[in-house]
Design a protein with these regions (language model features):
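Generic structural signal for small/hydrophobic residues in well-ordered secondary structure
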Residues: 1, 14, 65, 103-104, ...
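Conserved short alpha-helical interface segments
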Residues: 1-34, 60, 67-69
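C-terminal anion-handling pockets and recognition modules
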Residues: 13, 57-61, 181-207
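Short, aromatic/basic amphipathic alpha-helical patches
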Residues: 153-162
Length: 207
């Protein structure tokens, strides 16, 4: 303001002016510019055919994603008295105190699963594939997921072949094509928002 217009004013004055012009303060979100448009378009066309087949009950389409949910509180906005800070109690358990959650969306069934593990890597990923096959022993399974390194690991790919599970990777930098992302948003808004969990068990039970 001072550099461009040669005037000085406090932040509250600027905020009030912006509110009058119907602007609001929002948290920024990244717009990923590294995605390949052609690969995304090809994937969307392929996905359209896959989902059309799923409506005829073949194959069982599974969207699978992972998230690391911390025991400490996720801080967001909330109501507080004017002139008072909005305090949230925390035991500061540290960033290493977390649970890795595998989120599963069964498209044909309209159902979701949340399967917690101490970490997300090759071994629990194989366990998740085995669990999916146990739930659907006689159906063709198609798993859609991102390009996480452990998704591409040889042990995971071999397990998928052994279990007769087809893998369909999403194009890079395309979280908008993963519906499980909405599950993570719900989890952080309804479970971890402004709430510090005493233990990993407490976090899992509350989720």
């Amino acid at each position: 303001m001072r550099e461009r217009f040669g005037r000085r004013c406090c932040r509250e004055t600027i905020r009030a002016a912006l509110h009058r012009h119907k602007l609001s303060w929002k948290k920024a979100k990244k717009l990923l510019g590294r995605a390949d448009p052609e690969r995304r378009q090809a994937f969307v066309e392929q996905l359209r055919d896959v989902l059309a087949g799923a409506q005829r009950d073949r194959p069982l389409v599974v969207f699978l994603d992972e998230a690391h949910i911390h025991q400490d509180a996720d801080l967001g906005s909330g109501w507080a008295e004017r002139g008072q800070r909005f305090w949230v109690s925390s035991r500061s358990p540290g960033l290493s105190a977390r649970v890795s959650v595998y989120g599963v969306y069964l498209y044909n069934e309209g159902q979701v699963r949340l399967w917690p593990f101490p970490r997300a890597n090759g071994e629990p990923t194989v366990a998740v594939l085995q669990r999916l096959r146990t739930e659907a022993p006689d159906r063709k399974l198609l798993v859609l997921w991102d390009g996480a390194p452990y998704h591409r690991a040889q042990a995971v790919r071999e397990a998928a072949r052994t279990l007769d599970i087809e893998l369909m990777p999403l194009p890079g930098y395309s979280p908008d094509l993963m519906p499980v992302e909405e599950l993570w948003r719900w989890l952080r808004e309804d479970v971890t928002d402004h709430h510090c969990h005493a233990s990993a068990e407490d976090l899992v039970q509350r989720g």
